[in-house]
């Protein structure tokens, strides 16, 4: 009897201790009256940092030195009321507040605001509308946040920490037209209909030298795909600023990279305006969505007909306003990473509308290699498993193969920033682009965000609609004549995100294509990281700044082999 009572006492003691730990210290958040202008929906983020190098909201990443974030949804936050962040908030890299070690931290809260969309199909969703920043929760104008304070945090402490939201992120000024760079913004009829509210597309246009003095010339269109551009990048009409304070880029281990960028931008200006540079219109597109900083330039169940809107609404309007040739043979695409995937995808899905795709380090173009996951054969995205072993799948490496993040960790970070694919980050946007829409109006998960279990029905949908390697092979009898000679792929064999793996199997498939043969180009950079683009003569940190001059020249030399007979191949080469 005595022994039994002792056991019961010990069990109760353990449960009490566990219960105390599961409570953790709580945070109560209120909004300054002047900022609480309406009832808010959104994601409330609580951020911790053990240093004061920058605000905590700028220190969350996939890197080993990431700081900490916890998130919870807020629905209809009424003015004058408070929100409590406690143990149920989901976090990264610690999942729960009770797991965060006691210590001194700089603490901050951010409210990432959501808006309500009534979709064409009758679904209603709450999402963060892009506000000119390119879908960054820590930079989005209108988001509100607290001034960081230093506290001593102890998960065993029952004291309530008060946090006051007293700051708002200001609007971002619109870019200004100049002699060479112009800007355009249109309301898309297709996207407005899908989203149930006005939706816009924009672009930055770099005009060729002599545009005004050659009023009768019409120009080819060079389309640089990539992440959200605040303005046309890498073009500078004045020499580098001699007083510019040099920065340090840890990735490249280079001091003064900002000076290198300015010098490269100035050199590009001199080449662009000098003799022997092909005279084309070069554009960078703004197509941020409520899910990400761009749409991936294709039609999607969750994001709408961005492919059609860009190809049939935006591009013709640009060509109309700025004297583009306006025919598929005179358009080509290039880009890296997300832009690399987009460059290839639009060429495949619109084979007659574009005449060349130069895709560097593309996002996964074969879902047998969805980074380090095979969505068709693997059962779990986070772990390779056997009867006696479980191995975490790597997600981020350097050129030596040293791993700094796993697939699970990256997705844990995304889930802390937002559920229902609302983090504005990488794996979430792939689901927003590639997945069917769920019954709740949000993208269906390719894998469970908590466990990593892969949904094979979603994988089958991905394969038939967005696996570019599979689609090219499947549709080659129909589109081969329109694609031959147009596909160019480049990737480093030590890409940080393992994107080279998909290119390997894509290359194997392309080599086997017949009637016609592909006549494609695939090239690899030895020990090159993300995002190597085909230049064997320069280090990655230089070549990544030279997309325009590299691929505009390359296309201008190749176009004569793919252009229809009788078209104008000379007037724009003045």
Predicted regions mapped to residue ranges:
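Short, charged low-complexity linear motifs
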Residues: 13, 31-34, 292-298
């Amino acid at each position: 009897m005595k022994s039994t009572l002792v056991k019961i006492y010990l069990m109760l003691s353990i449960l009490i201790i566990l219960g105390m730990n599961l409570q953790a210290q709580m945070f109560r958040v209120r909004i300054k009256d002047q900022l609480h202008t309406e009832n808010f929906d959104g994601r409330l983020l609580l951020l911790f940092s053990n240093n004061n190098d920058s605000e905590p909201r700028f220190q969350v990443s996939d890197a080993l030195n990431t700081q900490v974030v916890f998130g919870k949804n807020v629905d209809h936050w009424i003015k004058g009321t408070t929100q409590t962040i406690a143990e149920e908030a989901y976090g990264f890299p610690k999942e729960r507040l009770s797991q965060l070690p006691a210590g001194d931290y700089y603490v901050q809260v951010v409210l990432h605001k959501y808006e309500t969309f009534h979709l064409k199909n009758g679904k209603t969703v709450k999402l963060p509308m892009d506000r000119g920043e390119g879908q960054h929760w820590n930079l989005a104008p209108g988001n509100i946040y607290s001034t960081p304070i230093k506290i001593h945090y102890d998960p065993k402490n029952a004291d309530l920490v008060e946090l006051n939201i007293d700051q708002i992120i200001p609007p971002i000024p619109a870019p200004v037209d100049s002699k060479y760079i112009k800007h355009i913004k249109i309301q898309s009829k297709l996207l407005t209909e899908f989203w149930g509210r006005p939706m816009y597309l924009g672009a930055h246009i770099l005009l060729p030298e002599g545009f005004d003095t050659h009023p009768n010339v019409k120009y080819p269109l060079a389309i640089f795909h990539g992440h959200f551009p605040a303005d046309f990048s890498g073009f500078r009409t004045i020499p580098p600023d001699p007083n510019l304070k040099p920065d340090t880029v840890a990735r490249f281990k280079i001091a003064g990279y900002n000076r290198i960028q300015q010098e490269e931008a100035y050199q590009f200006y001199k080449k662009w305006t000098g003799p022997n540079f092909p005279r084309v219109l070069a554009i960078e597109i703004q197509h941020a969505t409520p899910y990400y900083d761009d749409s991936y330039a294709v039609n999607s169940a969750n994001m709408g007909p961005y492919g059609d809107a860009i190809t049939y609404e935006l591009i013709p309007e640009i060509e109309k306003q700025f004297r583009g040739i306006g025919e598929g043979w005179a358009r080509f695409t290039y880009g890296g990473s997300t832009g690399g995937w987009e460059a290839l995808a639009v060429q495949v899905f619109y084979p007659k509308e574009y005449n060349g795709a130069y895709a560097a380090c593309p996002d996964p173009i074969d879902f047998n290699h969805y980074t380090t996951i095979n969505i068709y054969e693997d059962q779990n995205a986070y772990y390779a498993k056997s009867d006696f072993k479980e191995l975490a799948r790597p997600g981020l490496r350097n050129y030596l193969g040293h791993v700094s993040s796993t697939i699970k960790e990256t997705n844990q970070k995304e889930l802390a920033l937002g559920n229902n694919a609302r983090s504005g980050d990488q794996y979430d946007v792939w689901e927003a682009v590639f997945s069917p829409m769920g019954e709740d109006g949000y993208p269906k998960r390719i894998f469970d965000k908590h466990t990593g279990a892969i949904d094979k029905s979603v994988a089958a949908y991905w394969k038939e609609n967005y696996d570019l390697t599979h689609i090219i092979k499947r549709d080659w009898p129909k589109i081969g004549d329109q694609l031959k000679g147009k596909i160019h792929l480049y990737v480093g064999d030590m890409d940080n995100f393992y994107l080279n793996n998909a290119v390997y199997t894509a290359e194997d498939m392309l080599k086997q294509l017949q009637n016609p043969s592909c006549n494609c180009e695939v090239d690899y950079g030895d020990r090159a990281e993300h995002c190597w683009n085909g230049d064997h003569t320069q280090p990655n940190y230089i070549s990544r700044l030279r997309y325009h001059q590299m691929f505009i020249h390359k296309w201008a030399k190749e176009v004569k082999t793919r252009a229809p007979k009788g078209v104008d191949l000379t007037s724009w080469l003045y």
